UniProtKB/Swiss-Prot annotation:
SMART domains: WD40. Belongs to the WD repeat G protein beta family. Pfam families: WD40 (PF00400), WD40_Gbeta (PF25391). GO terms for molecular function: G-protein alpha-subunit binding; G-protein gamma-subunit binding; protein kinase binding; scaffold protein binding; signaling receptor complex adaptor activity; small GTPase binding. Keywords: Pheromone response, Repeat, Transducer, WD repeat. G proteins are composed of 3 units, alpha, beta and gamma. The beta-gamma subunit complex (STE4-STE18 complex) interacts with PLP1 and PLP2. Interacts with SYG1. This is Guanine nucleotide-binding protein subunit beta.
Length: 423
C-alpha cells in the first residue's frame, strides 16, 4: 500500500511539473500576446472600414441638426431657472450611481460607503437602506415596478435585491449573477424580469431574474464596455427590445436584445466613450467621450447629425452673455479669440461622464470631469447654463421621467434635486 501511494505521489509530481514547466508558461504568454495582437488588428481594420463608410455617408448627407435649426431662436440665460430645492444627505462616501424610479417618486443611490439608499423624491427622506455585498459598487438600477433593485461593480457580479416594505434596513438578496470575468460598469433593467449588464470583459449580457440565469451574451465590442442605454418608456413597465452600448474601443452599438449581433454601429472617435443616452423619442442617441465631445446620431439616417464641443459652445454665445470655461462665471466682455486662448488647455482635459435630456428634449445636461454639469441648447449647440453647488466632482445627472426635476450626484457624498424656481 505504501509503495502504491509513493508511486501515486511521484506520478502526481511529474504531472504537476509537466504543467508548470517554464516552456509551457512561455507558450501561454505567446498565445495571449497573439490574441491581443489579433484584437488590435481587428480594431484597426474596423476603424478603417468605418472611416470609409462615414466618408460615403458624408457625401450624401445634405444637412446637420444645427443647419436645420438655424432660424430657431436661441435660449437665454434667464430661461434656465433650475434651483437645488432638495439636498439628499445620508451617504458617507462618493456617490457611484443613482437612478429615478419609473414613476419619479423615488431615487435609488449607490455609494462606496457600502449602502444603497432609496429616497422619497418629494420630501428628500430615506425610505430604505440596503447593505451591499460589496462596497466597490460602480452602478445601480431600479426595476420598473420599484420592487427590485440591483448593484454591480468591481467584484464582477450583479446582485438583485428585493425592496422590503416592512424592514427598512435589510439585505434581501434575490439573485447573484456571476459570469463576467471583469468589472461590471453599468446595469439596466429592461423590465421586471430581465436585467442587462455591461462589463470590462468586452461583453454585455442579458439575465433572466426569475430563472436566475444568463439568457444571451453580446460580444461585438473590442474593448471594455463602459455604458448602457435603453429607450425610455415612462408609462409602461415593459420596454422595447432595443438597447445601446459604448466602450473603450470608441464604438457605440445598437442592439436587438433577441439577437447576439449588433444591428447598427457608430464609430465615435479614438477616446473612451463613457456616457450614452437615447433622445426622448428613441430615434436618436448621444455619446459622450473622454475627449470632451458629445456626438448625436440619428438611427433612421444612420449617421451623425450634431457634435457638441465645449469650444463651440462657448464661442457661439459671444454676441450674448456666455459662461467662461476657466471659472464658469457669467460674463459678457470677452471675444471668441480670448475665450479660446484662455481656456483651450483647460477644455482639453474635460471628459464627459454623464448625459441626459430634459422632458422636451430641447435641453441636454452633460457632466464633465472638472467643469461640472453644463446645460446645452440641443438645437443650437450652445451652452445656456450650469448646475452649480456641489462641493466635489459631479459624477452624474438624470432628469426625472415626468420631466419635473433633475438630479445630480457628486463625490461630496450628496445629491441635489433641481426644479424650476418660479417667483
Amino acid at each position: 500500500m505504501a509503495a502504491h501511494q509513493m508511486d501515486s505521489i511521484t506520478y502526481s509530481n511529474n504531472v504537476t511539473q509537466q504543467y508548470i514547466q517554464p516552456q509551457s508558461l512561455q507558450d501561454i504568454s505567446a498565445v495571449e500576446d497573439e490574441i491581443q495582437n489579433k484584437i488590435e488588428a481587428a480594431r484597426q481594420e474596423s476603424k478603417q472600414l468605418h472611416a470609409q463608410i462615414n466618408k460615403a455617408k458624408h457625401k450624401i448627407q445634405d444637412a446637420s441638426l444645427f443647419q436645420m435649426a438655424n432660424k430657431v431662436t436661441s435660449l437665454t440665460k434667464n430661461k434656465i431657472n433650475l434651483k437645488p430645492n432638495i439636498v439628499l444627505k445620508g451617504h458617507n462616501n462618493k456617490i457611484s450611481d443613482f437612478r429615478w424610479s419609473r414613476d419619479s417618486k423615488r431615487i435609488l443611490s449607490a455609494s462606496q460607503d457600502g449602502f444603497m439608499l432609496i429616497w422619497d423624491s418629494a420630501s428628500g427622506l430615506k425610505q430604505n437602506a440596503i447593505p451591499l455585498d460589496s462596497q466597490w459598487v460602480l452602478s445601480c438600477a431600479i426595476s420598473p415596478s420599484s420592487t427590485l433593485v440591483a448593484s454591480a461593480g468591481l467584484n464582477n457580479n450583479c446582485t438583485i435585491y428585493r425592496v422590503s416594505k416592512e424592514n427598512r434596513v435589510a439585505q434581501n438578496v434575490a439573485s447573484i449573477f456571476k459570469g463576467h470575468t471583469c468589472y461590471i460598469s453599468d446595469i439596466e433593467f429592461t423590465d421586471n424580469a430581465h436585467i442587462l449588464t455591461a462589463s470590462g470583459d468586452m461583453t454585455c449580457a442579458l439575465w433572466d431574474i426569475p430563472k436566475a440565469k444568463r439568457v444571451r451574451e453580446y460580444s461585438d465590442h473590442l474593448g471594455d464596455v463602459l455604458a448602457l442605454a435603453i429607450p425610455e418608456e415612462p408609462n409602461s413597465e415593459n420596454s422595447s427590445n432595443t438597447f445601446a452600448s459604448c466602450g473603450s474601443d470608441g464604438y457605440t452599438y445598437i442592439w436587438d436584445s433577441r439577437s447576439p449581433s449588433a444591428v447598427q454601429s457608430f464609430y465615435v472617435n479614438d477616446s473612451d466613450i463613457n456616457a450614452l443616452r437615447f433622445f426622448k423619442d428613441g430615434m436618436s442617441i448621444v455619446a459622450g467621450s473622454d475627449n470632451g465631445a458629445i456626438n448625436m446620431y440619428d438611427l433612421r439616417s444612420d449617421c451623425s447629425i450634431a457634435t457638441f464641443s465645449l469650444f463651440r459652445g462657448y464661442e457661439e454665445r459671444t454676441p450674448t452673455p456666455t459662461y467662461m470655461a476657466a471659472n464658469m462665471e457669467y460674463n459678457t466682455a470677452q471675444s471668441p479669440q480670448t475665450l479660446k486662448s484662455t481656456s483651450s488647455s483647460y477644455l482639453d482635459n474635460q471628459g464627459v461622464v454623464s448625459l441626459d435630456f430634459s422632458a422636451s428634449g430641447r435641453l441636454m445636461y452633460s457632466c464633465y470631469t472638472d467643469i461640472g454639469c453644463v446645460v446645452w441648447d440641443v438645437l443650437k449647440g450652445e451652452i445656456v447654463g450650469k448646475l452649480e453647488g456641489h462641493g466635489g466632482r459631479v459624477t452624474g445627472v438624470r432628469s426625472s421621467p415626468d420631466g419635473l426635476a433633475v438630479c445630480t450626484g457628486s463625490w461630496d457624498s450628496t445629491m441635489k434635486i433641481w426644479s424650476p424656481g418660479y417667483q
